[in-house]
């Protein structure tokens, strides 16, 4: 597999992570280096591990995974996106802070949801009979870098537009989930 192909696949896979990071950056204030590291590291790690998992399992579970992967991604993104929209409409409370998408189960759910497509890429790489290690490394690094860039851009948008960006970010997550669902059901 040549470098241009690997880079193209990496950028394409990182687009969902970038969009989610954009939404996360809009709701975290202030964004610290710790936030950037946590989300960038975890999104990159999951994006790198999923193709390896897909490659290792090969064709063994492809039919089972492909039957449900889009539902899993849709459910996770719709849940997190819906929660973001809900929190944006709640009354302002000085003691209440928005949930931090770079912590706990929210971060894990987002990491899984944005990297499920990378699992399918790993299955494809296995069918080509090539090594997965270089593509997985590049996929993870590109996802990590674009996640950090998305968070920083999201912060700028959040500072300028406030709750409107939080609502839009939540809706974007729901729409990404819907897009994944439609691509695997109606548009197949």
Swiss-Prot record:
GO terms for molecular function: manganese ion transmembrane transporter activity. It is found in: Cell inner membrane. GO terms for cellular component: plasma membrane. It is a multi-pass membrane protein. InterPro entries: Mntp/YtaF, Put_MntP. It comes from the Bacteria. Probably functions as a manganese efflux pump. This is Putative manganese efflux pump MntP. It comes from Citrifermentans bemidjiense (strain ATCC BAA-1014 / DSM 16622 / JCM 12645 / Bem). The lineage of its organism: Bacteria, Pseudomonadati, Thermodesulfobacteriota, Desulfuromonadia, Geobacterales.
């Amino acid at each position: 597999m040549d470098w241009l192909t690997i880079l193209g696949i990496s950028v394409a896979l990182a687009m969902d992570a970038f969009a989610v990071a954009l939404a996360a950056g809009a709701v975290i204030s202030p964004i610290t280096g710790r936030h950037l590291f946590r989300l960038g590291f975890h999104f990159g790690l999951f994006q790198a591990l999923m193709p390896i998992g897909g490659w290792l399992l090969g064709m063994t579970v492809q039919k089972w995974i492909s039957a449900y992967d889009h539902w899993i991604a849709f459910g996770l993104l719709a849940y997190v996106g819906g929660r973001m929209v809900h929190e944006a409409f709640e009354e302002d409370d000085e003691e209440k802070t928005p949930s931090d998408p770079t912590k706990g189960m929210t971060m894990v759910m987002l990491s899984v949801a944005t990297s499920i497509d990378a699992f399918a890429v790993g299955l494809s790489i296995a069918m080509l009979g090539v090594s997965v290690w270089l593509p997985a490394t590049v996929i993870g690094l590109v996802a990590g870098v674009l996640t950090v860039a998305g968070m920083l851009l999201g912060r700028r948008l959040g500072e300028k537009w406030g709750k409107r960006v939080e609502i839009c970010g939540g809706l974007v997550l729901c729409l990404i989930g819907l897009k994944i669902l439609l691509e695997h059901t109606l548009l197949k």
